[in-house]
Amino acid sequence: MAERSLLLVLHDVAPETWPDYRPFVEAVDALGEVPMTWLVVPDFHHRNPLEADEKFCKLLSRRVTRGDELALHGFYHYDDAPPPRTPGQYFMRRIYTWEGEFYALDHAEAKTRLAAGIELFRRRGWPLHGFV
């Protein structure tokens, strides 16, 4: 019989979302060592720069030390591109989600945002092995 395992992924991690996640993370921590992947948004919806909250950044650093993984999850996690022009684009960008940040970006802008997120992780000393 194979050993059982569990991987837990926390979506849209930012100082703004931490009050919702905190009780859940504390409950999971009480169960023992459950590895978590935190999908970190550097500036959630353009209103919540991660590095403006040093306490939260230190929390993420402690989680890395504990063995959790941080993954870059966009930069703003918000679709701020010009309005959609076709029914298909409208569905994908307004009905399905307003958070498809990279859906309408050109290569250069997508690369700029990814580079900014990668640089934030580098400054904080957080290993980065993925982007979701």
What residue spans do the PLM features occupy?
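Active-site gating loops and adjacent loop-to-helix segments of metal-dependent hydrolytic enzymes
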Residues: 84-105
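Active-site beta->alpha N-cap acidic-glycine motif
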Residues: 1-69
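Short, mixed-charge, low-aromatic patches
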Residues: 14-19, 72-75, 96-100
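Short, solvent-exposed beta-strand-terminating loops
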Residues: 69-88
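A short alpha-helix capping/helix-coil boundary motif
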Residues: 2-5, 36-40, 95-98, 119-124
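Conserved, mostly hydrophobic/aromatic
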Residues: 11, 73, 131
